């Protein structure tokens, strides 16, 4: 629970989007246990501050549908395989959270009786209010929708204050900063600017969904010291995307 010595929270309920690739650490495949444990500790710090935390994990560390698609595997089949990869990542993160005595629930868009709970909006909100971390798995349960879109959808459904997208760079740039030294980093962007400039924040479906519902986004470097704690207490870290630059 939050006490008087803790800083005031700007965001009390968040949806954290963490890519599957980030879980690999420096490896080329799979899950780096040190990354998983670090993420669990960061989440625990938020819970102890009184923040309600929902998560969506990607699955790119375990499965990438593009290669199979090029080999002739259908898009729908590939997307379903990718959804299952996100469930595997969710199971790993739940285990890491429970090892530090942090209660967590996995809610899957694809029913998997005996493995994870089926997604249920009202139950998810109840779990969050009770201090449990809720990991939303299997995307939206439908092909052709990314985990970014799933993250924005779940954030809107549970009434989150913001979507936080953890990446390997410190915000959104006008071009790839690794390839273009003149690339400009943005502090603030509107949804319209993201769409018209074609910036790689999230796919257009996710951005349009957030725009329609007024859900702000913040893109940040997960490796930045105390990034999540700084964000929920109102510090600007990375790039904020909203209806205007005064978000």
UniProtKB/Swiss-Prot annotation:
Organism taxonomic ancestry: Bacteria, Pseudomonadati, Pseudomonadota, Gammaproteobacteria, Legionellales
Compartments (UniProt record): Cytoplasm
UniProt binding sites for UMP: 59, 79, 140-147
Listed pathway(s): Pyrimidine metabolism; CTP biosynthesis via de novo pathway; UDP from UMP (UMPK route): step 1/1
One Pfam family in the UniProt entry: AA_kinase
Function: Catalyzes the reversible phosphorylation of UMP to UDP.
The organism's place on the tree of life at top rank: Bacteria
Residues involved in ATP binding: 17-20, 60, 64, 167, 173, 176
Entry similarity comment: Belongs to the UMP kinase family.
EC number(s) stated in the UniProt entry for this protein: 2.7.4.22
This protein's GO CC annotations: cytosol
GO biological process: 'de novo' CTP biosynthetic process; UDP biosynthetic process
Descriptive protein name: Uridylate kinase
